[in-house]
Amino acid sequence: MDHGEPQTVEERDMIGEARLSLPAETVPSPIPNFSSPILLAIDTCTNRSSVALRDGQVLRAESSWESDRRHTAAVSAQIRRLMDSCDIKAAQIGAVAVAIGPGSFTGVRCGLAIAKGMASARDLVVIGVAAFDIIASAQPNLNLPLLTLVEIGRERVAVQRYEWQDGRPVVAGEWRILAWRDLAASIDAPIWVCGDVPAGLMALLGQNAIVAPAPLNLRRAGYLAEIGYERWASGKVDDVLTLTPIYPPENKPQEQSRIGAQLMQ
């Protein structure tokens, strides 16, 4: 069971790097205040990473890029670069919002370890956000249900359905893992498809699948920062010791068609 402590040498290195990134300087309030109003957002769930800085009024800076295996060094460098470009000091950061999955095992653990390292070193507020919520928050309300996708490899995607309520996307049912073909076969009514839509999956989708344009498919840390700041302001924050990643359950192949049908209900 994950109790929030690093379990591997790699994770300990990640946290050590994070602590070097932001030295301990202040102890912020769990609610945004004028002494530490900046939120840092980190998403490393897949090979598309993103970081952002947001204050109480605006998104100060954002950077997204395709990552390789050197997640930790690249993320730390991007965070420093954004802070320097905005003249933001470590003492001004009061919270860290982090994408907790699903996604690749290494990627999800990387972002979470960095966020925990920073939060532990400086007693920062930490907010964990599902990758699906980041994707959904970027979509326009077209009065269509949403299918948010996160690629997890081997021609499979993690899928979460959303419905619109009071102008906001709301989770509808449990998230699942589906093979591309099973997902495509399950779509029998118009639905907005967004997130990681690989070319191979795109070729299988029929006319009922309305695929979001490329800019809306990118998981951007700016949207993660927006969700995180809203939760911070309302006191809906997480415990750095117990916050854990979301890992994909392994569905049996024979179950996938049934699960796809359930998603469309």
Which residue ranges define each predicted feature?
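Intrinsic disorder/low-complexity segments
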Residues: 1-36
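Surface "functional belts" at beta-alpha junctions
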Residues: 34, 58, 70, 125-219, ...
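Stable alpha-helical structural segments in soluble proteins, enriched in small hydrophobic residues
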Residues: 82-86, 121, 139, 224-232
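DPxDG-like acidic metal-binding loop motif
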Residues: 97-126
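Acyltransferase
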Residues: 169, 212-265
